[in-house]
A protein has these predicted regions:
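Short, charged, amphipathic alpha-helical segments
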Residues: 52-56, 80
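Short, Lys/Arg-rich amphipathic alpha-helical interaction segments
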Residues: 70-84, 88
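Short, well-ordered alpha-helical segments
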Residues: 27-31
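Alpha-helical coupling/stalk and coiled-coil linker elements that connect catalytic or binding modules
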Residues: 1-25, 41-46, 50, 63, ...
Length: 320
């Protein structure tokens, strides 16, 4: 209710609206809540892929906002100037993490080597399994000529009646019991090799995430500051967008208890059906009685005054 604070909020909305008219708006939707992640970084914990991507999103949004709105002196220029640039960290995260489900081969030379070995092992095991699929001896035993996986192991679908004739380890069976999924003895070692490489890959990914977390931990204050500023800017520009959408005007505030609304429109009623009203109160008289028949607009008028007053106190422009 402090008029100085209200006018500052209205200035911010006005300046954001001016920037929107000049250059359009910025998408703040990638501003993720990183406060819990920053708290974990402060105690030396490692972040997961999703948390690191959220940090990258904050840094990308910061850069986009600063690049998009050129320097100009107004009520929000200070916030824009206080956004901290941490490009190196953002570049490192983007280099290592492709998506929430994938770490880049470029994240480390060790990871690239492990994945290359894993690819070679996969090619070898598929080659061995294809030999069995095309073998006249084993084709009779197979329910279908496909390679499948069960419990992370490559298997072949074998007819249940031939399980004794097909050397290997049973991992699963079909719902009817007519098909057994058997890991052929010839590929057990290759399956073991792949599993070992998968464990090495997972361990290397943990090392990469831990390293990125250490680097992010060096910028906890900047990250938290950027998050708080971007949230504030998001709110300010949302107010400006609403003002633009409603064709709203900046209210002139006073401390004298005077209300003088001209062609005020209830903000929640459809624009093509709302009936504008004029309300004047506080100078010649301080009490206003509204009378009229049912559905004549008495309640809507009272609510319009209340809502427009609250909007103005919140730094919003009003539809009037």
């Amino acid at each position: 209710t402090d008029i100085t604070d209200i006018n500052l909020r209205l200035d911010e909305t006005n300046d954001a609206l001016s920037r929107i008219f000049q250059k359009g708006t910025v998408d703040f939707s990638q501003t993720k809540d990183i406060r819990a992640s920053v708290a974990r970084l402060k105690v030396g914990s490692s972040l997961n892929i999703s948390e690191l991507l959220n940090i990258s999103a904050i840094l990308s949004c910061e850069k986009h906002v600063k690049d998009y709105y050129e320097h100009r002196e107004d009520s929000i220029s200070g916030m824009l100037e206080n956004l901290a640039t941490v490009d190196t960290l953002n570049s490192q995260i983007k280099k290592c993490i492709i998506s929430e489900d994938e770490i880049s081969d470029d994240a480390s030379s060790n990871l690239r080597s492990i994945r290359r070995s894993k690819s070679i092992a996969n090619d070898r095991i598929h080659s061995e399994l294809n030999k069995l699929l095309n073998s006249p001896t084993y084709r009779t035993y197979l329910q279908d000529y496909v390679i499948t996986t069960r419990q992370g192991r490559y298997c072949l679908p074998v007819k249940a009646e031939y399980k004794s004739a097909f050397p290997g380890m049973i991992h699963d069976q079909s719902s009817t019991g007519s098909t057994l999924f058997i890991e052929p003895a010839a590929v057990v070692k290759l399956n073991n090799d792949i599993r070992e490489l998968e464990l090495k890959e997972a361990a290397e990914i943990e090392v990469i995430l831990a390293d990125l977390s250490v680097k992010a931990g060096e910028h906890t204050e900047e990250l938290l500051c950027n998050y708080e500023i971007l949230v504030e800017l998001d709110c300010i520009f949302a107010k400006a967008q609403l003002a633009r959408h409603m064709h709203a005007s900046r209210p002139v505030m006073n401390t004298s208890g005077i209300i003088n609304i001209k062609k005020g429109r209830h903000p929640l009623i459809e624009p093509h059906t709302v009936v504008p009203i004029d309300i004047y109160l506080g100078t010649d008289f301080k009490l206003l009685i509204i009378t009229g028949p049912n559905t004549g607009g008495k309640t809507v008028s009272l609510k319009t005054v209340g809502l427009l007053t609250l909007m103005a106190q919140s730094g919003l422009f009003i539809p009037a």
